[in-house]
Amino acid sequence: MARKGLVERWKKPKKFKTREYTRCKICGRTHSVYREFGVCRVCFRKMANEGKLPGVRKATW
């Protein structure tokens, strides 16, 4: 319940630019969010394994 309230509050426009912070567009997680994709590492890995991110493939060496 608390996370849902934070996500709703996060969507509102901020009074000052410095108060904005990155959140995952899917789950609302605040830590380890990739700016390029706008999702957190957990959602990124899940989407990459499902093939939903074009051009992203698992590294092998």
Curated annotation (Swiss-Prot):
Give the GO terms filed under biological process for this record: translation
Q: Which Gene3D superfamilies match?
A: 30s Ribosomal Protein S14, Chain N
Q: Domain of life of the organism in this record?
A: Bacteria
Q: Which InterPro entries match?
A: Ribosomal_uS14, Ribosomal_uS14_bact, Ribosomal_uS14_CS, Ribosomal_uS14_sf
User: What keywords were assigned to this record?
Assistant: Metal-binding, Ribonucleoprotein, Ribosomal protein, RNA-binding, rRNA-binding, Zinc
Cofactor remark: Binds 1 zinc ion per subunit.
**Which Pfam families did the record assign?**
Ribosomal_S14
Q: Which GO terms describe its cellular component?
A: cytoplasm; small ribosomal subunit
Q: Which cofactor does it need?
A: Zn(2+)
Q: Name one GO molecular function term.
A: structural constituent of ribosome
Coiled-coil ranges per UniProt = none
Where do the annotations place Zn(2+) binding? 24, 27, 40, 43
Q: Subunit info?
A: Part of the 30S ribosomal subunit. Contacts proteins S3 and S10.
Q: Which function does this protein serve?
A: Binds 16S rRNA, required for the assembly of 30S particles and may also be responsible for determining the conformation of the 16S rRNA at the A site.
Q: Which family does it belong to?
A: Belongs to the universal ribosomal protein uS14 family. Zinc-binding uS14 subfamily.
HAMAP family for this protein: Ribosomal_uS14_2_B
Q: What is this protein called?
A: Small ribosomal subunit protein uS14
Q: State the organism of origin.
A: Thermosipho melanesiensis (strain DSM 12029 / CIP 104789 / BI429)
